[in-house]
Amino acid sequence: MSDNPQEYELDWDVEKRLKLNDAGLVPAIVQADGTNEVLMMAWMDTHALAYTLATRRGTYFSRSRNEYWIKGLTSGNVQEVTGVALDCDGDTVLLTVKQTGGACHTGAHTCFDNDVLL
């Protein structure tokens, strides 16, 4: 099994349901297994989703770095993926994960804990 997400191809039955944006990406919402707390939002392409499904490791595409990002590979804050679902339109992916350490790149438990607006 390769550690290069780009070598993974998404099953056609899944891929034909996805509605990717013009950049070939789909938003991925990540929730904590057991509590359903929203931890983060990231982007995936078909290779990142295929790699995630094959390895159960949260894998995303960084738009700013233009590269794949396997959550926790450098930080140790890994995501064991326990569930993956598409929304009714196929334009958003929902991942359920067992999170080790912080989910946010800042090290915080969630990316949504700093600026509560309401």
From Swiss-Prot:
| Entry cofactors | Mg(2+); Zn(2+)
Q: Name one GO biological process term.
A: L-histidine biosynthetic process
Cofactor note as given: Binds 1 Mg(2+) ion per subunit.
- Which residues are recorded as binding Zn(2+)? C88, C104, C111
List the EC numbers from the record. 3.5.4.19
Binding-site residues for Mg(2+), renumbered to this chain: D87, D89, D91
A Pfam family of the record is PRA-CH
Location(s), subcellular: Cytoplasm
Q: Which family does it belong to?
A: Belongs to the PRA-CH family.
The record's HAMAP family line, in alphabetical order, gives: HisI
- Protein name in UniProt: Phosphoribosyl-AMP cyclohydrolase
Q: Which organism is it from?
A: Corynebacterium glutamicum (strain R)
Corresponding gene? hisI
